[in-house]
Amino acid sequence: MTKVKTQFNRRSFIKISAAAGGGMLIGFSWLTGCISDSKTETVEVPNEWFEINGYIKIGDTGMITIYSPNPEIGQNVKTSMPMIVAEELDVNWEHVVVEQAPLNTGFYQNQFAGGSLSIRLSWDALRMAGATGRRMLLEAAAKEWSVPVSDLSTSLGIIKEKNGNRTITYGEIASKAVGIEIPEEVELKDLKDFKLIGTSKKNVDGKKIITGKPLFGLDFNREGMQLAMIQHPP
């Protein structure tokens, strides 16, 4: 793992320079997004949600909401950007719900689409968001059990005691994690340890797209709204 300084504070969570370096490959397919997946695991709808940071909220049942910060205009960042967060958070992708983040320059930077820059500019911020959430959950569990964080590990949304039999899910400890201070440093995974990035996942909006569900600006409607168009280019 690689240690990096988070540069976060509690409520302005990620005012970070996201001038990322390095490229990556995330696998997903428009076609698989149109296929029914009978193996998808189900998680009960939470009774309560806990906001861990500006990218992540966790339900008491273990359901995870990850916010995708950049506009989705067909380039599939609404799938790929949350995958980066989920990788470092160490959660089961089948338990993740993706939501489009609102415009909020206090939380996010570079909220635009163009030039194939979304991943490139947000790579560091997305990874740190996931890693910071994971660290806060670990610290909450360590405090609950009165053990060092180094005695704990995570796997797909479950915290385990390395030398014991105790386990606790992210959903069970999330309420305690919201009170944990943002760590000054977090450990990022080595690229060789990626389990989610590089795999093929369905487009999160694939089913909505092929069934005509409202998704885009063109779908917006308000009572009394009038439409206009340009007759010819200015």
Specify the residue positions occupied by each region the protein language model found:
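Cofactor-binding beta-sheet edge motifs in enzyme active sites
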Residues: 2-27, 35-234
